[in-house]
Amino acid sequence: MKLSQIKALLKTVDRVSFKLPNGELVPAHFHVTEVGKITKNFIDCGGTIRNEALVGFQLWTANDTEHSLKPQKLIDIIELSEEKLQIEDHEVEVEYQGTTIGKYGIGFDGTHFLLLNKQTDCLAKDNCGIPIEKQKVQLVDISSSGNTCTPGGGCC
């Protein structure tokens, strides 16, 4: 989800809440301790130079259980970051401390912002010898698709 989408959604909710991939909610007294620009410049295993840009949020939970981040306060933090750091409208990545620091994509279910698991992937499969996964088709599906040859149909 892009930063502009998060800002628009924040204007529609009464409270900010995040749900972990396992369904648990991040404690309501969380803090957003960072909003920043993340850049990653690297060479993939195929030798291609790549540049990525993300917006990073860091969530942190302290023992101040009376704290509650209001949607407008988060919008204010985001807008200050956009102004001072020249943050553009990139995808947002959220860091949250579990057993280690987890990095998540973000979604929204109408009530909660969803922390979505991220996956690693090879960016140069064509250069690494990784076979391209072929689409599996069952024979029964082929014959029922209507793309069969008939005598006089001109397909042969």
Identify the meaning behind each predicted range:
Residues 51-64:
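Short glycine-rich, basic-tinged beta-strand/loop micro-motifs
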Residues 76, 80-133:
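Helix-rich interaction surfaces within compact, conserved domain-sized segments
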Residues 14, 53-55, 90, 111:
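Residues at beta-strand starts and edge strands
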